A protein has these predicted regions:
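N-terminal hydrophobic targeting/anchoring segments and the immediately downstream early-domain regions
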Residues: 1-24, 141-157, 162
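Hydrophobic/aromatic-rich, well-ordered segments within soluble, folded domains that form packed cores
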Residues: 80, 84, 88-91, 307-320, ...
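Short linear, low-complexity motifs centered on an aromatic residue
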Residues: 96-111, 131, 229, 236-238, ...
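Short, intrinsically disordered, low-complexity segments enriched in Ser/Thr and Pro
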Residues: 107-141, 251, 374-376, 501-510, ...
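Glycine-rich, acidic/polar active-site loops that bind/position phosphate-bearing ligands
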Residues: 143-328, 337-340, 347-590
Length: 729
C-alpha cells in the first residue's frame, strides 16, 4: 500500500492542465443549446401543442394524449439534431442522487421495419422498478411497480446521447418516493398562502414564486491519491489522518489564485453547465486547501434544485477527465473546514415584487415587514423541523465545528432591521392608533430602504441570515438535495402565513379595521418570535448557554433530530399542508434513519479493515525495525551506555505496542457493538445504537492511528497524508 502512495505522488508530479476548447461563438449563442426550452418548443412544436405546454406550465392545465404525442414527437426531432439515441425519465429518489433508465427510440413499424419513435405515453409516464429504491418500508420487495411522471415545469435536456426528462417518482399506490413530488406540493402551498397575504396589500397579485440560489462547496483531490485512500473511496471522507503542519491557518486559500489544473476543470464545467441552461456565475477558492465553490444566478426553486442535482453529476464526470475526484462529503478532512450548500431563498410576486426586499413606499415596506416577521415566526416555531431537514451522518461532523452554523437555529437580521422591529413594537400600543401615530409609524417604516442600503451586515455564524433581499440557510450539507430543506422551509412558511392570515381575518370579522388588525398581529408576532433573533457569535459557548435560556433547542444526536419530523408542530406543517400523508412521513423518517445507520456501519467496517489490515501491520514492521536497531546497539555499547542511549526507542516500542493493543481492542468492541445494533428490531433502535454505541469508536480508533502516523517512518506509511491530499495541485 505504501508503494501505491508513492506511485500516486510520482504520477501527480507529471500532471498538467487539460486543455479546454471553448466555443468561438458568444455565450448567448450556445447557452441552453441542450435544453428543450420555450424557444425550441416554438420551433419544433405545432402552435396548439406549444400553447398546451405553456398552459400546463403556467396554469397547471392537463395535457391530453393527442397534444402529448405532438410534444413527444417534437422533442424527439429536436433531440435527433444532437444525434441522441436514447431517452430517460430522470428522477430524484431518496438516495441524495438522481436515477435514470435509458431506453432507445428504436421500435418495429407495422411492416417490421426498424423505426425511431417517441410517443406521448412514453413522455408522460413510465414504470421503473421501485423495489430497489429507498421506501421506508411502505413497499414490499415483491411490490415492485412504481411510476415516473413528467414534470412539465422543468425542461427536458440532453446529456451525452440521452434525452433526459425530469419526472416525479411515486409508488403504485400513489405515495411519493422522491424529493420532487413533495417539493412541488410545498411550492404550491407557499404560493397559495403568500398570495392570500399579498392580496391584503395589492389585489393584483395572482401568484407568488419561491426562488433559490444555491452555493455548492466541494473539494478536489487528485484521482491517484484518492484511489490510494480506501476510506475516501468507500465513505467519501478520511477516517484517519493527522492534520498537516500547515492547513488553513494563514487564510491564504480563500479567494486566492485558482490553480491551473483546477481552472481548466472549472472552465469545462461552466461550459457544460451553460449548454444545459444552468446559469453558473461565480467560482472561487474556499477557506480550506483544495476546497472550492460554484454558484449560479437565482432561479425558480424547482428548476434550481434540478440544476443543482445535474451540476453535482456533471462535476463528477468532468473531474475524472482532469484526473480529479470531486468530494461532496460535508467533512472529508478533519481539522479544516467542511463543505456546505448555502440555500439563498426568496419569495417574489408575479407583479415583480421581491417580498424580502425593502420597497420605496411605506405601504410597500409594510408588505416587506409582514413577510420578514412571518419568516421569524416560521423559524421560531419550526426549529426542530428545519434541523431535521439538514441533519445527516456527514453534516453532523460539520455543524457547530467553528466553521459552520451551529445546530441551534437562530435568525440574523442585522442590528438596524432588528432595531426597526423593536421600534415598531414600541410604537404599537394596545389602544387604537391615532392618525399622528400612524403617520409616525409609516415614516419610520418608510426609512427601511435607506437604513438597509449600507447597514445590512453579514454574520457567517448564523444558520439563517437575512442578507438584504433574501434569507440564506447555511446549515445544509454539500451532498444534500436542496429539496430536503426547501420542502420544509416553503411548507413551514405556508403554514405560518395561513395562521397569520387567519388571525387577521378573525379580528376583521369581529369588527376591527384590517389595518388595525394587521398592526396588532404583527406586534404579537414580533414579540412572540423575538427569542429566535440573534446578532452575535453563533460559534461561542456563551451562545449555547443563552440559547438554552431562550428555550431554543440544540440537538446534536442525529437520530433524535430526525425523529423531530414526527413531532406535533412538524406534523401540523407537513401533514396539515398536505405535503405528506401519514405513510409518506413515516417513509421519510425510516429512510433517513436507515441512511444514517448504513453510513455509520460502512465507516465502521472500513475503519476496522484499515486499522487491522493496513495500520497495525505497518506499526509492527516499524516496531521490528526498532527492535533490530536496539539489538544492534546492545552489541556495541556497554550496558550503562546502552540504557542511556536507547531509552527513547524503547519508549517508542512500548508506545507503539500499547496503541496496537488499544486499536485491536477498540476494533473488536466496535464490531461487537455493531452486531448488537444489527439485531435490534426497529430502525429507530438501530440508529440510536449506531449513534451511541458504535460511532464513538470511530474517533477512539482514529486517535490512536493519528498518533502512530506521527511516530512511524514516513517511508512505510501506507496511506497518502493530509499534506499530500490537500497541498498537491
Amino acid at each position: 500500500m505504501s508503494k501505491m502512495r508513492f506511485f500516486a505522488l510520482q504520477e501527480l508530479a507529471n500532471r498538467r492542465p487539460v486543455k479546454v476548447d471553448y466555443p468561438s461563438e458568444k455565450l448567448a449563442d450556445y447557452y441552453g443549446n441542450h435544453v428543450f426550452d420555450r424557444k425550441k418548443m416554438q420551433e419544433y412544436l405545432p402552435s396548439e401543442a406549444y400553447k398546451a405546454v405553456i398552459n400546463a406550465i403556467e396554469k397547471g392545465t392537463p395535457i391530453n394524449r393527442e397534444m402529448a404525442d405532438m410534444i413527444a414527437n417534437g422533442m424527439k426531432n429536436w433531440a435527433k439534431t444532437f444525434n441522441v439515441t436514447h431517452y430517460t425519465h430522470w428522477f430524484q429518489p431518496l438516495t441524495d442522487g438522481t436515477a435514470e433508465k435509458h431506453d432507445g427510440f428504436i421500435e418495429f413499424g407495422e411492416d417490421g421495419e426498424v423505426i425511431e419513435r417517441f410517443s406521448g405515453k412514453l413522455l408522460i409516464q413510465q414504470e421503473p422498478d421501485a423495489s430497489s429504491f429507498p421506501n421506508g418500508g411502505i413497499r414490499n420487495t415483491f411490490e415492485a411497480r412504481g411510476y415516473t411522471a413528467w414534470d412539465v415545469s422543468s425542461p427536458a435536456f440532453i446529456v451525452d446521447s440521452t434525452l433526459c426528462i425530469p419526472t416525479i417518482f411515486i409508488s403504485y399506490t400513489g405515495e411519493a418516493l422522491d424529493y420532487k413530488t413533495p417539493l412541488l406540493k410545498a411550492l404550491g402551498a407557499v404560493d397559495k398562502a403568500a398570495t392570500e397575504v399579498c392580496r391584503m396589500f395589492d389585489p393584483n397579485v395572482k401568484r407568488v414564486f419561491a426562488n433559490l440560489g444555491w452555493e455548492q462547496e466541494y473539494f478536489l483531490v487528485d484521482t491517484a491519491l484518492y484511489n490510494a485512500r480506501p476510506d475516501l473511496c468507500l465513505t467519501g471522507r478520511t477516517l484517519m489522518g493527522h492534520s498537516s503542519a500547515k492547513d488553513q491557518q494563514l487564510d491564504d486559500h480563500y479567494f486566492g489564485s485558482i490553480p491551473p489544473r483546477v481552472t481548466s476543470f472549472m472552465k469545462e464545467l461552466e461550459l457544460e453547465c451553460h449548454k444545459l441552461g444552468i446559469p453558473v456565475k461565480t467560482r472561487h477558492n474556499e477557506v480550506a486547501p483544495n476546497q472550492f465553490e460554484l454558484a449560479p444566478i437565482f432561479e425558480d426553486v424547482n428548476l434550481a434544485n434540478d440544476h443543482n442535482q445535474l451540476v453535482m453529476d456533471l462535476m463528477k464526470r468532468i473531474a475524472s477527465k482532469h484526473n480529479f475526484t470531486v468530494l461532496l462529503h460535508e467533512k472529508p478532512f478533519k481539522g479544516v473546514n467542511g463543505s456546505g450548500k448555502h440555500n439563498n431563498w426568496s419569495l417574489c410576486t408575479d407583479t415583480g415584487i421581491n417580498l424580502f426586499s425593502p420597497a420605496k413606499t411605506a405601504e410597500g415596506n409594510m408588505l416587506f415587514l409582514t413577510f420578514i416577521v412571518n419568516v421569524l415566526m416560521m423559524v421560531y416555531k419550526n426549529q426542530d423541523l428545519l434541523r431535521a431537514s439538514i441533519v445527516s451522518a456527514g453534516n453532523s461532523h460539520r455543524l457547530g465545528a467553528n466553521e459552520a452554523p451551529p445546530a441551534i437555529l437562530s435568525i440574523f437580521l442585522g442590528r438596524h432591521l432588528s432595531h426597526m422591529l423593536d421600534e415598531v413594537v414600541a410604537r404599537l400600543n394596545d389602544a387604537e392608533l391615532t392618525p399622528d401615530e400612524k403617520k409616525a409609524l409609516q415614516l419610520g417604516i418608510g426609512r427601511i430602504p435607506a437604513i438597509l442600503q449600507d447597514n445590512t451586515d453579514r454574520n457567517r455564524t448564523s444558520p439563517f441570515a437575512f442578507t438584504g433581499n433574501r434569507f440564506e440557510f447555511r446549515a445544509a450539507g454539500s451532498s444534500a438535495n436542496c429539496a430536503a430543506s426547501m420542502i420544509v422551509i416553503n411548507a413551514a412558511m405556508a403554514h405560518q402565513l395561513n395562521e397569520f392570515k387567519t388571525q387577521i381575518d378573525k379580528l376583521v370579522n369581529g369588527g376591527m379595521e384590517q389595518e388595525e388588525a394587521l398592526y396588532k398581529v404583527l406586534k404579537e408576532t414580533i414579540i412572540a418570535s423575538q427569542n429566535i433573533r440573534f446578532e452575535g457569535d453563533g460559534y461561542s459557548e456563551e451562545w449555547k448557554a443563552e440559547a438554552a435560556r431562550r428555550g431554543l433547542t440544540n440537538i446534536c444526536h442525529v437520530p433524535e433530530a430526525i425523529l423531530k419530523f414526527n413531532d406535533e408542530q412538524s406534523r401540523a406543517v407537513l401533514i396539515g399542508e398536505k405535503i405528506f400523508n401519514e405513510n409518506e412521513l413515516f417513509c421519510r423518517i425510516e429512510v433517513e434513519l436507515e441512511k444514517f445507520t448504513k453510513k455509520v456501519q460502512i465507516e465502521s467496517r472500513v475503519l476496522g479493515d484499515l486499522a487491522i489490515n493496513h495500520i497495525v501491520p505497518t506499526a509492527v514492521i516499524y516496531q521490528n525495525r526498532l527492535l533490530e536497531n536496539l539489538r544492534g546497539l546492545k552489541e556495541i555499547f556497554s550496558t550503562e551506555e546502552y540504557e542511556e542511549l536507547t531509552e527513547d526507542r524503547k519508549n517508542l516500542v512500548r508506545e507503539i505496542q500499547n496503541r496496537i493493543l488499544a486499536i485491536k481492542k477498540a476494533v473488536h468492541n466496535m464490531t461487537e457493538a455493531r452486531k448488537v445494533a444489527n439485531h435490534l428490531g426497529s430502525q429507530v433502535e438501530k440508529a440510536f445504537s449506531y449513534e451511541e454505541q458504535v460511532r464513538p469508536y470511530l474517533e477512539e480508533i482514529r486517535d490512536h492511528i493519528d498518533h502512530l502516523e506521527l511516530e512511524i517512518d514516513d517511508e512505510i506509511w501506507p496511506l497518502p497524508k493530509y499534506r499530500e491530499l490537500l497541498f498537491t495541485k
